[in-house]
Amino acid sequence: MAISSVENGVARRGLMVVISSPSGAGKSTIARLLLEDPKMKLSLSISVTTRQRRPSEIDGVHYHFITIREFERLRDNDELIEWAEVHGNFYGTLRETAEIALADGQDMLFDIDWQGADQLQAKMPADVVSIFILPPTMRELQQRLNRRAEDTAEVIETRLQNARFEIQKWVKYDYIVINEDLDRSYAAIKSIINAERLRRDRRPGLFDFVTGLLEEDPGM
C-alpha cells in the first residue's frame, strides 16, 4: 500500500470524510467551510453522473459527465465504490480515483446521503470517517427550511417527512453532531477530522519513526 503524505515526518494514508444530514441541518454550509479552509486540506470528491451538464458546470471540475451506458459498465464492473439514482439520473464515485487519492495521502470530502455512506463503509471501512449532522429540534429544522424561501409549503413538508426517515439512520455513523450553533458544530467536525488523522492505524510511517527515535543517541 503506497503512502506518500508526510506529516511531522510520519507518512499517512488519506481519509474519506463522509458528511450526511437531512435537508436544512447544515451539511452544505459546513462542507463549504471545510473546503474553503486551507488548514483542513480537504478536496471534494468529484462524482461521475449521467445528468445533463448545466451551462455553468465544467466537466471534470463539478462532475465527470458520462453516458448511461458508460455508467452501467462502471457499475457492473465494480468500478464504483458508491452510486445512487436521484431524480432519474445516476451518480457515483470512481474506485480508481479514490484509491489513488488515498494512497497519495489526500483527504476527500463526500457530501452524500446515508445510502452512499453505507456503500463506502461496506467497501472501504478502514478509510471512512462518517459524520451525521442532526438539527437541535424538528421545529428548528422546519424554521430553517422556511427561512430559505426556496420551496413551497408542500415541498417543505415533504423534506420534513424525508428528514424523519433519514434521521433514523444516525446509528450507522461514527460521529453525531447536533448543529444548534454553526461555529461550535464546525469546530467539532474539524476536531473529529484532525483526531482521525492522528490515529495509529492510519499512520504506517509511525513504525519507522519510532524505530529511528529509539535508535537515536541523544548525546550525538
From Swiss-Prot:
What NCBIfam families does the record point to? guanyl_kin
UniProt cross-references to Pfam families, sorted A to Z: Guanylate_kin (PF00625)
Q: Which residues form the Guanylate kinase-like domain?
A: 14-194
Alphabetical list of Gene3D superfamilies matching this protein: Guanylate Kinase phosphate binding domain (3.30.63.10), P-loop containing nucleotide triphosphate hydrolases (3.40.50.300)
Return the protein name: Guanylate kinase
Q: What is the similarity comment for this entry?
A: Belongs to the guanylate kinase family.
Q: Which reaction does it catalyse?
A: GMP + ATP = GDP + ADP
Sorted keywords for this record are:
ATP-binding, Cytoplasm, Kinase, Nucleotide-binding, Transferase
Which sites bind ATP? 21-28
Quote the subcellular location field of this record. Answer: Cytoplasm
The role this protein plays is:
Essential for recycling GMP and indirectly, cGMP.
Tell me which species this is from. Answer: Brucella abortus (strain 2308)
- EC numbers on record: 2.7.4.8
The record, for HAMAP family, names:
Guanylate_kinase
Q: Which GO terms describe its cellular component?
A: cytosol
Q: Which GO terms describe its molecular function?
A: ATP binding; guanylate kinase activity
